[in-house]
Design a protein with these regions (language model features):
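Short beta-strand element of the alpha/beta-hydrolase
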Residues: 88-96
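Primarily recognizes the serine-hydrolase "nucleophile elbow" in alpha/beta-hydrolase
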Residues: 152-235, 253, 258
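Cap/lid segment of the alpha/beta-hydrolase catalytic domain
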Residues: 55, 98-107, 117, 124-152, ...
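Acidic catalytic loop of the alpha/beta-hydrolase fold
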Residues: 226-227, 276-280
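Short beta-strand/loop motif that positions the catalytic acidic residue
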Residues: 265, 271-273
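Active-site glycine-rich loops that stabilize anionic/oxyanionic intermediates
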Residues: 95-100, 275
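N-terminal cap/lid segment of alpha/beta-hydrolase-fold proteins
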Residues: 21-86
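C-terminal catalytic histidine-bearing segment of alpha/beta-hydrolase fold enzymes
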Residues: 272, 279-339
């Protein structure tokens, strides 16, 4: 994540906002379910109530506003069932927002609309981002960020994957066809889930935590925090300092963040990014791709010359925004859905 993050991921800076709304609620017919039945692990101080904000016309995406959610201290999941035919596959979706807020519609509910139309169950995770977007932060501010700077988002993701597997039969899901899809910081969370599944970061709560939290496949769209240079930038903002001196002779642009320990057990992965992305550098995808290939992990990557950052599924003049068809084809290639 480059210094432009001080504008908070371009669109989701919310430097110009419309009227502040109440806490986010899903569309009628869908219910948010708290993922933690009791105390939330590694809870941070709450700076205020959860709020949803809508961007004003200076921050439109494909001519439409977007909604960002911040001050999330009680994470939830919302399940969206397939329309018509059920493929048996499921995807847990991680919206982006720099680990400071969540692009809940652009990179959340709109993704679920697409997935369910393709016969895929979607589970939207509203993971913890306990505070308001924007920099700089005082030392006393709730700590959030990529793992291991903060364990909260990864804990929420691990817990949700276990819950989806635990309820697979009830929800008509194949427990061996459950993947993850994320954007920007949510793309980093995809990589973290793909490489930190052997052990939960929190004490087991119930039977759901006995289920594997390894995704069966992973989709990272314009991911951040993955290259060594991105990790070094994160470290200067207060993340794990070890990356500053990690492999001083390594290529900092194409070397992988050491907190993403890729192995041959990392699930098959799809990567997509634009070369003119000025929030998360294309080297984040390249570094992860190289590490995956080196470990023998099936991986497909699509790089486009133009397209920028934070476009979600909204079609623009740039070909990169046709990526959902590429993902659908790839899911057939790896036998998660029928071709």
């Amino acid at each position: 994540m480059k210094p432009l993050l001080f504008a908070l991921c371009a669109v989701f800076a919310f430097g110009g906002l419309s009227a502040q709304q109440t806490a986010w609620q899903p569309s009628p017919g869908h219910t948010q379910v708290p993922i933690w039945p009791g105390a939330v692990p590694d809870a941070q101080p709450v700076t205020g109530p959860e709020v949803a904000r809508t961007t004003v016309r200076e921050w439109l995406v494909a001519g439409r506003p977007a909604v960002g959610v911040s001050n999330v201290s009680r994470p939830t999941m919302t399940r969206y069932s397939p329309d018509g035919k059920n493929t048996g596959a499921a995807v847990v979706v991680f919206p982006g927002g720099g680990y400071l807020d969540l692009a809940i519609d652009l990179e959340g509910t709109e993704v679920c609309d697409w997935l369910t139309a393709k016969g895929i169950t979607c589970v939207l995770l509203k993971y913890r981002v306990p505070g308001e977007p924007g920099y700089p932060k005082p030392a006393s501010y709730p700590k959030s960020g990529p793992y291991p700077e903060s364990p909260m988002a990864l804990e929420d993701a691990q817990r949700t994957m276990g819950l989806v597997r635990f309820h697979a039969a009830e929800w008509h899901i194949d427990p061996h066809k459950i993947g993850v899809l994320g954007f920007s910081s949510g793309g980093h969370l995809v990589a973290a889930m793909s490489t930190h599944f052997a052990k939960r970061l929190y004490p087991a709560v119930d039977a759901a935590d006995k289920e594997s939290c390894r995704p069966d496949f992973a989709v990272a769209i314009y991911p951040g925090h993955l290259s060594l240079s991105a990790a070094q930038w994160d470290a200067k903002q207060g993340a794990k300092k070890v990356v500053i001196h990690y492999l001083a002779t390594a290529d900092k642009d194409l070397g992988l963040n050491p907190d993403i320990p890729v192995t041959h057990q990392t699930p098959p992965t799809f990567l997509l990014q634009a070369e003119d992305d000025n929030v998360d550098n294309v080297n984040d995808s390249l570094a992860y791709y190289i590490a995956l290939k080196s470990a023998g992990v099936p991986v497909e990557m699509h790089l486009f010359a133009r397209g920028g950052h934070a476009f979600g599924l909204r079609r623009t003049k740039f070909p990169i925004t046709g990526w959902p068809q590429l993902v659908e084809t790839w899911l057939g290639t790896i036998a998660m859905i029928s071709k």
